[in-house]
Every structure is written in structure tokens, then in C-alpha cells.
Amino acid sequence: MAEVKIPQATAKRLPIYYRYLRLLSNSGKNRVSSTELAEAVKVDSATIRRDFSYFGALGKRGYGYDVQSLLDFFTKQLNQDTLTNVALVGVGNLGHALLNFNFHQSNHVRISAAFDVNEDITGTIQSGIPVYPMSDMKEQLKLQQIEIVILTVPAPVAQKVTDELVEVGVRGILNFTPLRITVPENIRVQNVDLTNEMETLIYFLNHFGSTEE
């Protein structure tokens, strides 16, 4: 099957569908309707049908979707059968929390290396992950063929570290810093600003009540 170009909004929903389908499969359920799926993942059924339509005929009218077939399909789409090693750059409080988390609910993503300037933790194993000094970052990323990095360094050094990641060939950055880093067009950045998300939540609660967006 040729690579399918889909809207970014649809792409963001695919992991949500996958996780719920995996729950259904583990519980022994054989089929699911778009209405049932919509109620579970809080996405309206019309949107689900439109999302699925980008990939062709995934279900049957009057029958719904075969859970295992759909799960197998999204497993391939999301590369769930391939292990992706990622690196963590910045092992402060948030970095430590992410090392402890280490995508335990995912079968295909794993933090395999971490980097920091703190000599008290470099050269040690934290939550099962080796922590290297920043001076070893480029060498280790190349050696371990890591192309995706989680960035949790202080904001003042975020762009400098990003530039080094670009030089070594990193293709994707999950950016937890408040700085909107600058990268070439061929590099994908996902920004996760916890402070901004909390302030947005407080604003909506104060002005619109508790209705979900």
C-alpha cells in the first residue's frame, strides 16, 4: 500500500484509536462500531469515519470494524512492531520523571540514553538508563543511531543544544522547554509546554466552566 498523506489532526488521533483497539483486543472483543469507538475515545463518529476513510475500506456497513484487523492495520501505520530508541537531553526534575515513565505503556518507544551536565549523575544509571555527559552527546547519538530526542534542558541553552542536535542528524524533537526552538524545515518539533497548558485550563475554567473543549 502506498504511503497515505493524511491531515495532521487525523495523525494525532491515530494513537488514541490504537490504544483503545488494543484494550478491546485484550478483552476479547471481536468488533466495534464507530459509535462505540466515538463514545470511548471522545471523538464524534463522523470524524472517526472520515479519519478511517483516508486509508480505504476498513469497515463494513452494518457490521462495523473487525477489532483485530483494525488493530493490525494501525500497528503497521504507527510502526508499533518496530522499536524506536529515543534520547533524553536534560535530566533535571522533569527529565527524571520522564526516565521513570519511559513509555511503559508503549511497546515500540524506549528512552535508551540520557545526557546532562551534572557530574553527580553522568556516568550513572538512572531508572535503568545510562546518563552520559553532554560532551558525549553527538558521538552517542550517532553510535546508537538515535534520531528522536526529548528536550528538557533549561530555556537559556535550549537553542544551543538544538543546534547541536541538528548537526548530528536528529529528525524529531519533543520539546518540553518554554522556548520555541528554531530548526530547519526537514526537522519535526512537537512542543509540550506544561505551564501554558495549565494556564489555558485555568482560563477556560474561569471563563467557560468545566465543559470539555
Curated annotation (Swiss-Prot):
It is found in: Cytoplasm. Keywords: Cytoplasm, DNA-binding, NAD, Repressor, Transcription, Transcription regulation. GO terms for molecular function: DNA binding; DNA-binding transcription factor activity. Residues 16-55 bind DNA. GO terms for biological process: negative regulation of DNA-templated transcription; response to redox state. The keyword NADP does not apply. SMART domains: CoA_binding (SM00881). NAD(+) binds at residues 90-95. InterPro entries: CoA-bd, NAD(P)-bd_dom_sf, Rex_DNA-bd_C_dom, Tscrpt_rep_Rex, WH-like_DNA-bd_sf, WH_DNA-bd_sf. It comes from the Bacteria. GO terms for cellular component: cytoplasm. Modulates transcription in response to changes in cellular NADH/NAD(+) redox state. PANTHER family: REDOX-SENSING TRANSCRIPTIONAL REPRESSOR REX, REDOX-SENSING TRANSCRIPTIONAL REPRESSOR REX 1. Belongs to the transcriptional regulatory Rex family. NCBIfam families: PRK05472.1-3, PRK05472.1-5, PRK05472.2-3, PRK05472.2-4, PRK05472.2-5. Homodimer. This is Redox-sensing transcriptional repressor Rex. It comes from Ligilactobacillus salivarius (strain UCC118). The gene is rex.
